[in-house]
Design a protein with these regions (language model features):
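Nucleotide-activated donor-binding/catalytic signature segment of Leloir-type glycosyltransferases, i.e.
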Residues: 93, 103-138
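Carbohydrate-associated surface elements
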Residues: 22, 37-43
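Membrane-proximal helix-turn-helix segments that form the acceptor-binding/catalytic region
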Residues: 1-16
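A charged, aromatic-enriched C-terminal amphipathic alpha-helix characteristic of glycosyltransferases
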Residues: 195, 202, 212-243
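Conserved donor-binding/catalytic core segment of Leloir-type glycosyltransferases
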Residues: 17, 54-72, 77-81, 89-92, ...
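Acidic anion/phosphate-binding donor-loop and adjacent secondary structure
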Residues: 28-29, 41-57
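Nucleotide-sugar-dependent
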Residues: 132-137, 145-167, 174-185
Length: 243
């Protein structure tokens, strides 16, 4: 349901723009133009950085976001990490309460989860970093993992800003179900299920076994082009066109 602030904003709006169809549907009763625009991506992520990996025979999988958030599907994420000891999982984002932002708290389950990540020999925790450092780090990855519990997720698995940042690298993305990309298997691989991530570990394993094909030059080009078409400057131009 819409909050009071959202209702008040809609009453005075001449135009409603959102990154998800689901949000636009909530405003169906308001008779003003409505437009869907995807998340944008900054030039930092579209820039090409030199590859600095020294272990090219080892697969590196990236994950970015506040690791203290309760809507991460922690059991599934830890299962995937445990089942793939030869893969390095690099995580960017807060994992200490003092560095956290909205949506994270150091309760017992969260501490247990973070401790498991810290103890895992194939996990690297970079913590919160500046945008340019994150962008450069993501470009070193071979694949990306998104693993949220849709039932707890504040966006309910509709769209995530980080997807565009991952797409900008061209590398394959394995994710929980995301409605905004439900018909774009060329951009993101995801299970069909919306109520659980039970099939995500197997999808991850299958993708990694065939990572060369998923990261072919053609596939990488498709992902990069999609991200480039959603750069912030183009999104601003699109919004200006609606006004």
């Amino acid at each position: 349901p819409l909050t009071k602030d959202a209702i008040d904003a809609a009453k005075g709006a001449d135009l409603i723009i959102s990154v998800t169809r689901e949000i636009l549907q909530k405003y169906a009763l308001y008779k003003v133009p409505k437009h869907l625009i995807n998340h944008g991506v900054s030039e930092d992520f579209l820039k090409q950085y030199p590859v600095s990996k020294f272990d090219n025979d080892v697969i590196h999988v990236g994950f970015s976001g506040n690791l203290m958030r309760p809507d991460i599907d922690r059991n599934v994420l830890l299962t995937i990490i445990e089942y793939h000891p030869a893969i390095i999982f690099e995580c960017w984002g807060s994992y200490k309460e003092k560095d956290g932002n909205i949506g994270g708290a150091a309760d017992k389950p969260t501490n247990a989860f973070i401790n498991s990540l810290v103890a895992a020999p194939n996990v690297i925790l970079h913590g919160a970093v500046f945008t340019a450092e994150l962008a450069a780090g993501l470009q070193q990855m071979d694949a990306f993992l998104i693993c949220y519990d849709i039932k707890k997720d504040q966006s309910k698995g509709t769209n995530y800003h980080k997807i565009m940042e991952y797409l900008a690298t061209g590398k394959v993305i394995i994710s929980n179900n995301v409605t905004a990309y439900a018909d774009r298997a060329d951009l993101i691989l995801m299970p069909e299920e919306r109520d659980n991530n039970n099939k995500l570990p197997e999808l991850f394993s299958k993708t990694i076994r065939n990572i060369a094909a998923y990261n072919s030059n053609a596939n990488q080009h498709t992902r990069k082009q999609f991200a480039s078409k959603n750069r912030y400057t183009r999104q601003i131009e699109a919004i200006a066109h609606f006004l």
